[in-house]
Amino acid sequence: MVDVGSLSKGMYIKYEGEIYRVIDVNKHFRARGSGLIRTKLKNMSTGLVREVNFNSGEKVEEAEITFRKASYIYNDGEKYYFMDNETFEQYGIPVSDIEEEKNYLVENTEVDLIMHDGKPIGIQLPTSVVLEVVETEPGFKGDTVSGGGKPAVLETGLKITVPFFVEKGQKVRVDTRTGEYIERA
């Protein structure tokens, strides 16, 4: 059991018989009273996000999950398929379970499969991935003064802002937590 005051973003808990990932935590403390912990929880089996309020001092069960190294191999429109790097077993995860992560997946991307009771319930991406720019406007000399950027579409369909010197066909490193450009790869 874990005290709700120690909940943090990214943790997995068991609440009302279901496995949830903590998406957001806000702690509010009232004068002379107990605190209120407001959370956003994503149900790992349905993908639905719900807001749950806890009083400080309450306890929740931490979910028993394990991580397995795997590689993304392909998708068939309904599921994304991953191969376990040790056993070579293939796992299919529905698109709805990895809605946010799918924009960073290209063939052979190394991920951690999040497992519960021997079944995959989601994936954890590396902190950054390298993706190819497939569409962007040409840069102009002198635009570097503003320090801004220009829109670009990457090979997975992800839209980000890149510096003016990045051109179509180049590979860029993208932070998977924020979706922002890091550097040219």
Curated annotation (Swiss-Prot):
SMART domains xref list: EFP (SM01185), Elong-fact-P_C (SM00841)
SUPFAM superfamilies xref list: Nucleic acid-binding proteins (SSF50249), Translation proteins SH3-like domain (SSF50104)
GO MF assignments: translation elongation factor activity
CDD domains (alphabetical): S1_EF-P_repeat_1, S1_EF-P_repeat_2
GO BP of this protein: peptide biosynthetic process
Origin: domain of life: Bacteria
Alphabetical list of PROSITE patterns matching this protein: EFP
Entry annotated with the keyword Ribonucleoprotein: no
UniProt key word Glycoprotein: no
Pfam family, one: EFP_N
Compartments where located: Cytoplasm
Membrane-crossing residue ranges in chain numbering: none
UniProt keyword list: Cytoplasm, Elongation factor, Protein biosynthesis
Record GO cellular component, one term: cytoplasm
Pathway in which the depicted protein is active: Protein biosynthesis; polypeptide chain elongation
Family, per entry: Belongs to the elongation factor P family.
Record function comment: Involved in peptide bond synthesis. Stimulates efficient translation and peptide-bond synthesis on native or reconstituted 70S ribosomes in vitro. Probably functions indirectly by altering the affinity of the ribosome for aminoacyl-tRNA, thus increasing their reactivity as acceptors for peptidyl transferase.
Designated name of the protein: Elongation factor P
Native source organism of the sequence: Thermosipho africanus (strain TCF52B)
